[in-house]
Amino acid sequence: MDTQNTPVHIKLWHRDFWRLCFANLLLMSSVYMLIAAIPYFLILEKYQLWQIGCVLLSYGLGLFLFGGFCSYLVQRYRRNMVCQLSILGVVVCLSVLYYLDTFWNIKFSFEVLLAVRFLLGAFLGLAQMSLASTLVIDSCESFQRTEANYITSWFARFSVAVGPLVACFVYIYFGMEYVFPTASVLALGAFVLVSRAKFPFKAPAEGIKVFSL
């Protein structure tokens, strides 16, 4: 078994690093696809502009929910499992409202929409922290970490363009109602890529506080 100090990859651009970079791209693109989709559907449901703004804002606030607990979670539990479960949380948040509304005709209140968007932001924030700050770092050697962080951040920036472009393509050729399922598929793709990546063994640190800034 590899230890924490065992050199695993000499080159940065190895298979697992590619998987993590594209997982980051798919995950962030799935969320950026909703930039146009959420206002579109909320306007159809006759929501007021301030309500639409609050729904969008709740996502941003949710990003910070697990920030103080991330260090404890990745040390207490397997770091790749923390990331994978967080991504599954994103998938559930992307899917639940769409499928219940489309197939079961269940309408949700404004408060429930706020809660789901808040949870979406919370799960995405934890997935991003565990992916970009932990898994990517652990997949490369110490002298490559600055370059790895730089590359990963550019994949995330690229998703700002990819997400809305994919949403526009889906809207033009299939309809806006397919944007949410497509976003869920992209997030599932990120889950598969992370689950396929391999990481060296890392002993958990001792004395980690449950909450830390």
Locate predicted features:
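Helix-loop boundary and gating motifs at the non-cytosolic
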Residues: P7-G60
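Helix-to-loop junctions at the C-terminal end of transmembrane segments
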Residues: F66-R79, Y171
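C-terminal membrane-cytosol helix-exit motif in multi-pass small-molecule transporters
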Residues: V185-A203
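Residue-level signature of mid-helix packing/kink "hotspots" within the transmembrane helices
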Residues: G60-G68, V160-A161
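C-terminal ends and interior cores of transmembrane alpha-helices
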Residues: L88-K107
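Juxtamembrane intracellular "pre-TM" segments in multi-pass secondary transporters
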Residues: D2-H14, F199-L213
